[in-house]
Amino acid sequence: MNTKFAFSAGVWNLNTGADPFGPAVRPERPLEEKLTTLKALGFDYVQLHDDDAVPMDVPAGQVEAYARRVKAMCDAAGLAVEFVAPRLWEDPAFVDGAITANDPRARAAALDRAKRTIDIMNVLGTKRMVLWPAREGTYIRESKDAVHAFGHLLEYLNAILAYDRGVRILGEMKPNEPMDLMYLPSTGHFLAMAARTADPPRVGVLIEAAHCILLGLDPADEMAYALWHGKLWGVHLNDQNGLKYDQDKSFGTVDLRRAFNAVDVLVRNDYGAHGEVVGLDVKAMRTQPHDAAMKHLSNSKEVFERLVAVSAAIDRDEWASYVSSRDYEGLEMLIVRALMGA
């Protein structure tokens, strides 16, 4: 059982409160301030999109120098970079998808962006690329040939693996939003794709709790499945009020028992003992004032750490006795009492 964890969050988790229905309600924080804030909150790593690190309008010949300045900022703040993720969903060139676009020029641009991301990663000191295929799907099924689309996804993964023999790809799957019908909507789908790549040992998953809930699945079971495969290389912990849009609520604030089970499966299976990081992908409520718009991060970290303590302290012999006697009512109360501090 591992009870010692390192923590990370994305720079996007310190945001302005803008949403699809309203503008920003807080000022934007400069990158350097975001980094120092994360460190002050007790985080060890930062997560970045490619254009968080190096904006897309930076000329190709200046990308490395720009990335070096960001690396110096991270070093000064005392943060390592956990991963970099290519942002393949905002550019108008990817309106019909990036990796699975019908237009071969869009697919080529998506691969160029992945290569640029890897070049940035190498400067920032990480070999971990998180791939969220946000627009890889359809609004109507007839618009794309799904068999060809899966082939494009495999070609894309193989091209990334060939570009840098040290890179590791972490697929982060989600069933919907922004696309109505997503290709590879679940962990299992991506792991099946990973097995078909040219180098399966370098392809794993990052599991986001809210995405599992949107699938109608339990995050703990999804994590367990990836752990069984030896493929759980990252997590995004948060919470979710049911099957709706991706809310990124503070971890454990909706369903504490579900959160406990996610923590417990990580603790019991030594997640973190081999360099894996606990990522918190949570948003401040739009109502939060600017100077309090970081409590969602500290609160989520505290909930995780408290649940680790519950997992470590719970009587495993009593737990096992309830299982062996098939007394699941007794087991349920053991868990509930532990969560209530009774």
What residues fall within each predicted segment?
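Active-site-proximal loop/turn and secondary-structure-junction residues that shape catalytic pockets
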Residues: 13-15, 50-52, 85-90, 133-137, ...
